[in-house]
């Protein structure tokens, strides 16, 4: 295929893997299997049904639903009709957030689930351009402008029987550079931007992904990330389709928490070979594994820790595993049979690896999952690049790096003036390739600032080395840089991740310094572990003495990175926090301080807690036991 569209892509791989299972979904407590041929047939019916409802080529259709088969076939139906999908996050709770995206994209139809329908009904009176709301679930009564997906499929069947040629002409008229998707950014200080992704953006990125990550035919991927996110979109179902694999989705619960509880059950039942993950999920997986080990008693826990240390020492940074540590290999195999095989059984027993994205994955987590036999390979990308730029994989991985740059992609590291910096020096990551977006929808100014002479300026900071050609290291955001009073700059993510991953007493952390006299740390405490610590010391956590002790413990965790501490020298002392602002509220999706992949939105945090930041730069606020900190730990 030469520059295929998504339509060409689906037709090609359906012909190749016709009777293989592509979609897996739990219905009435039973997992159902939908083949490649059946998937395409349903996409054809939905696409023809949308045409029968009057959908024109190039029009936009918003899609708001939990992950399920109809999310996939719904999107494919939109694309077969020659239209553009506008995937929306189910985590958008504010009516204004949904309204902006639907109005800004000029959506003329909306596909949604029964669970998400109330959000749509609330804003529909303000959306006169929306002609039809298509509900994936059967309702007793449909309101104005609503219809069920079964009716769309019925209309599609009639349309194909009456004039199949018109439908075929429509989907064959789709060109590689036609828009396939408008993907909205999370947005930080302004309205989110609509990222315009073409058919060729998608198919090019799948080709690129295949150059670094391999999957076997009939492997299963359980998709636990939101399908509206570009990472799940491409690294998930389109890449799996290209290998003849299948995708399963987590059964939807009545609440978000119920859906989360379904994840471990779905993992055991679907026995995935690969999953996509983000750091927040990775930490939860590790926490659950270690809770299970602890429950087996001190002897098992001790053996587990010995096995873990041995495997981590043997694996080193993965690319250099073994070497003079080869004497550990027999122990690695022995402990794997005794300990880690049981851990993997909790993940279905067939897990080969995770692909980590969405945010930087701490190197200790990478070492951990490799040790237990389920490597979590860090990748890097952004929606504007559809999204994959590089990834580690079993054939080539370096812990701490973001992986090998995909094929047919140019990457350069530039300074603030746009000049290429020498190998080893940090600068902005700038990329060029067929996966780079067409631009931002109805925002030519932002497009011109982001894409210059065909090069996408990512806003991320990284470097390359001569020692490992073709690999990229990502170290943070240009916009996240701490800026000292004398203009020096530093990327804070390394310290933040190290502290939150390494300390049981710190749940979340953001460093701040915007040309201030010193750096401060905004810290969300883990109150449960702090209160347990107090009780172990014989101090009531509800007393003033308890409050002081808990704050002292948090300070001790930070001080471990200072001279004399166990982590001394890991990070420059000049950038370590001189004051702590302990916060009374966590960064959550509800207060919009994390995005759909659980990545903290730094700008929003700094705005939300602006008063606490200002207070930390006062004489009273700099003191650890200040009134606001004392109150926050209770």
Summary of predicted features, one role per range:
Residues 248-251, 328-333, 345-356, 361-410, ...:
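Conserved ATP-binding loop and adjacent catalytic segment of the adenylate-forming AMP-binding
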Residues 185, 405-409, 419-424, 428-484, ...:
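Conserved ATP-binding/catalytic segment of the ANL
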Residues 2, 80-155, 169:
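Structural core segment of the AMP-binding/adenylate-forming
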Residues 22-68, 76, 92-99, 148-156, ...:
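Conserved AMP-binding/adenylate-forming core of the ANL superfamily
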């Amino acid at each position: 295929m030469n520059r295929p569209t998504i339509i060409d892509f689906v037709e090609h791989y359906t012909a190749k893997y016709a009777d293989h299972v592509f979609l897996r979904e739990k219905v009435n407590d039973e997992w159902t299997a939908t083949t490649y041929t059946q998937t395409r047939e349903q996409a054809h019916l939905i696409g023809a049904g949308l045409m029968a409802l009057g959908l024109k080529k190039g029009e936009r259709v918003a899609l708001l639903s939990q992950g399920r088969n109809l999310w996939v076939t719904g999107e494919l139906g939109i694309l077969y009709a020659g239209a553009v999908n506008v995937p929306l996050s189910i985590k958008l709770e504010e009516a204004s957030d949904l309204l902006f995206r639907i109005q800004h994209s000029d959506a003329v139809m909306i596909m949604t689930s029964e669970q998400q329908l109330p959000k749509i009904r609330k804003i529909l009176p303000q959306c006169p351009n929306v002609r039809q709301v298509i509900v994936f679930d059967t309702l007793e009564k449909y309101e104005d402008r609503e219809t069920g997906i079964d009716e769309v499929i019925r209309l599609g069947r009639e349309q194909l029987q009456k004039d199949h040629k018109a439908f075929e002409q429509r989907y064959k008229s789709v060109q590689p550079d036609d828009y396939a998707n408008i993907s909205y950014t999370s947005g930080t200080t302004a309205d989110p931007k609509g990222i315009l992704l073409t058919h060729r953006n998608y198919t090019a990125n799948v080709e690129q992904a295949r150059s670094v990550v391999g999957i076997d035919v009939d492997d299963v991927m359980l998709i636990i990330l939101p399908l509206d996110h570009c990472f799940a979109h491409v690294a998930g179902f389109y890449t799996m389709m290209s290998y003849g694999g299948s995708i399963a989705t987590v059964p939807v619960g009545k609440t978000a928490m119920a859906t989360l509880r379904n994840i471990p059950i779905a993992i055991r039942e679907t026995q995935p070979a690969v999953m996509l993950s983000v750091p927040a999920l990775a930490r939860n997986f590790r926490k659950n594994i270690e809770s299970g080990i602890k429950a087996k008693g001190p002897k098992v826990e001790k053996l587990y820790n010995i096995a873990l240390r041995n495997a981590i020492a043997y694996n080193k940074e993965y690319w250099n595993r073994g070497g003079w540590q080869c004497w550990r290999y027999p122990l690695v195999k022995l402990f794997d049979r005794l300990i880690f095989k049981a851990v993997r059984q909790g993940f279905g027993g067939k897990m080969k690896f995770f692909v980590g994205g969405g945010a930087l994955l701490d190197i200790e987590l990478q070492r951990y999952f490799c040790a237990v036999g389920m490597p979590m390979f860090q990748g890097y990308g952004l929606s504007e690049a559809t999204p994959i730029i590089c990834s580690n994989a079993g054939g080539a991985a370096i812990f701490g790096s973001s992986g090998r740059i995909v094929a047919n992609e140019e990457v350069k590291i530039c300074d603030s003036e746009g000049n290429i910096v020498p190998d080893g020096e940090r600068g902005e990551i700038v990329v060029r390739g067929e996966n780079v977006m067409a631009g931002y929808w109805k925002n030519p100014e932002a497009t011109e600032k982001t894409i210059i002479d065909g090069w996408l300026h990512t806003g991320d900071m990284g470097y390359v080395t001569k020692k490992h050609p073709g690999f990229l290291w990502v170290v943070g955001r240009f916009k996240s840089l701490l800026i000292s009073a004398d203009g020096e700059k530093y990327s804070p993510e390394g310290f933040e991740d190290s502290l939150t991953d390494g300390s049981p007493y710190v749940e979340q952390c953001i460093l701040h310094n915007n040309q201030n006299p010193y750096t401060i740390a905004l810290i969300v405490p883990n109150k449960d572990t702090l209160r347990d610590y107090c009780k172990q010391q014989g101090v009531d956590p509800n007393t003033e003495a308890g409050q002081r002790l808990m704050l002292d413990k948090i300070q001790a965790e930070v001080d471990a990175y200072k001279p004399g501490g166990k982590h001394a020298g890991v990070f420059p002392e000049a950038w370590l926090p001189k004051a702590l602002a302990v916060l009374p509220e966590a960064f959550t999706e509800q207060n919009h301080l994390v995005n759909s992949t659980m990545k903290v939105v730094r700008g929003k945090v700094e705005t939300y807690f602006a008063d606490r930041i200002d207070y930390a730069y006062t004489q009273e606020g700099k003191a650890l036991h200040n009134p606001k900190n004392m109150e926050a730990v209770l």
